[in-house]
Curated annotation (Swiss-Prot):
GO molecular function terms noted in the UniProt entry: 5S rRNA binding; structural constituent of ribosome
Keyword Acetylation carried by entry: no
Listed GO biological process terms: translation
Protein name per its UniProtKB record: Large ribosomal subunit protein uL18
One Pfam family in the UniProt entry: Ribosomal_L18p
Keywords per UniProt: Ribonucleoprotein, Ribosomal protein, RNA-binding, rRNA-binding
Subunit note: Part of the 50S ribosomal subunit; part of the 5S rRNA/L5/L18/L25 subcomplex. Contacts the 5S and 23S rRNAs.
SUPFAM superfamilies hit by this protein: Translational machinery components
Entry keyword annotation includes Oxidoreductase: no
UniProt source species: Enterococcus faecalis (strain ATCC 700802 / V583)
Amino acid sequence: MITKPDKNKTRQKRHRRVRNKISGTAECPRLNIFRSNKNIYAQVIDDVAGVTLASASALDKEISGGTKTETAAAVGKLVAERAAEKGIKKVVFDRGGYLYHGRVQALAEAARENGLEF
């Protein structure tokens, strides 16, 4: 019998492979993305200290409704603003094993437009 591969397991495998190559420092932290069916979450992480420096999600009160792509763009803008408050300009983008398309792309472009460099 042919078994269908689990999409989330293959994504996690991709993410582990990428995480072996990418890590964030205090000078250039990692912008990590997690995407669920309804919401999207973004964190700016210093992997050396193991600390989250800034975060934003679709569940934040500042973000209003709209399509999932519009919400992702709003999350990107918000995480860029919160990172700028902490003096963070440069980050390493970690797409979390997701394809750079749709909500992930909208979040990344909004973060770039609002001052994050990656």
